Regions:
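N-terminal secretory targeting modules
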Residues: 1-82, 279-294
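Serine-esterase "nucleophile elbow" of acetyl-processing enzymes
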Residues: 48-124
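Structural beta-sheet core signal
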Residues: 85, 151, 186-188
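Short glycine-rich anion-binding loops that position phosphate/pyrophosphate groups of nucleotides
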Residues: 90, 154-157, 192-193
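Surface-exposed cleft-lining segments at the edges of enzyme active sites
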Residues: 93, 123-130, 155-166, 203-207
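Oxyanion-hole/transition-state-stabilizing segment in secreted/luminal serine hydrolases
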Residues: 131-168
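A short helix->loop->beta-strand "cap" motif at the edges of active sites that frequently abuts
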Residues: 181-183
Length: 294
């Protein structure tokens, strides 16, 4: 669950970021000599405002589990591909308007089309989950023996101030457990929380730095564990930042249906490779210009 006051008040790194910002380009609140302590107080107020704007989720993510067939086919022969999705509210697609617009459903449908086989989707993601919650999710899906597992995790580790090295190590252990079970793993690393518009400076800069630090640590751990990392912040950060009205849902924190399609398209090339399917699928949704992503 979102924990912005904790991020604002208790992270010593925020004090350093705020201090550096004050000494650099004009300072905070237009005062170049603003003190870091004042910046932290400002960040606490911004966290309060952001939490009021974002609110608490009152609806569940769309349920999209099921069997997906290639487009235009009512039945197919052969063994179905099994796809599992693990992680937090992003993986669960909280904010998507319908089941067909979730990350899991988009990936399952595209995987079915590309492979010509049926795809069985199971989503075990939990809203508010941190990396430490992956173990329980893995237990839920191991008996299903998925061919590919997709993990999207990290935002709640940042807002709850879990050390990047700790969160990344736990993620690496989770990937290793899945790989030892013969499951291919694709991981969408922590998105750039600095693109969340309700966060003002200096809180936005601190959130961006912390989330990108975690993403870098995740990428290293996932690679070492035999997984396939996808740097969501690098691919989609600028897209979400420049067009928040398109890619964020009404709460301005979770992605919209368009946002989740963008995330799914970023993940799709590695998902296809993990399933043994060669593809030149672009990492951005159709209609998005290549210069919109960092």
């Amino acid at each position: 669950m979102l924990n912005l006051p904790s991020l604002a008040l208790h992270d010593e790194r925020l004090r350093r970021v705020a201090s550096a910002a004050a000494k650099g380009g004009g300072g905070l609140l237009g005062v170049g000599t603003a003190l870091a302590g004042t910046a932290v107080g400002l960040a606490a107020f911004q966290a309060y405002q952001a939490r009021r704007t974002i609110g608490t989720p009152t609806i569940a993510p769309p349920y999209a589990d099921g069997r997906y067939l290639p487009e235009g086919k009512s039945a197919v022969r052969g063994v179905s591909l099994r796809l599992a999705v693990l992680g937090d509210s992003g993986a669960a697609s909280l904010g998507a308007e319908g089941a067909g617009e979730t990350i899991g459903a988009t990936l399952a449908a595209d995987l079915a089309d590309a492979s010509g086989r049926a795809v069985i989707l199971t989503n075990a993601a939990v809203v508010g989950a941190q990396s430490s919650d992956l173990a329980e999710q893995i237990e839920r899906i191991l008996t299903l023996r998925p061919h590919v597992a997709v993990i999207v995790i990290g935002g709640n580790d940042v807002t709850h101030l879990v050390r990047p090295s700790t969160a990344a190590r736990i993620l690496g252990d989770s990937v290793r457990q899945l790989r030892e079970a013969g499951i291919e793993v694709v991981v969408g690393t922590c998105p750039d929380l600095g693109s969340v518009r309700p966060l003002g400076a200096p809180l936005r800069q601190a959130a961006s730095k912390l989330s990108r630090d975690l993403a870098a640590a995740q990428r290293a751990e996932v690679t070492a564990a035999g997984g396939r990392p996808v740097p969501l912040a690098d691919i989609l950060g600028e897209l979400f930042y420049s067009e928040p009205e398109v890619y964020f849902s009404a709460d301005q924190f979770h992605p919209s249906s368009a946002g989740y399609r963008a995330v799914a398209f970023a993940l799709l090339p590695e998902v296809l490779r993990a399933a043994g399917i060669s593809s030149d699928v672009p990492a951005l949704p159709s209609g998005s210009s290549s210069d919109s992503a960092a």
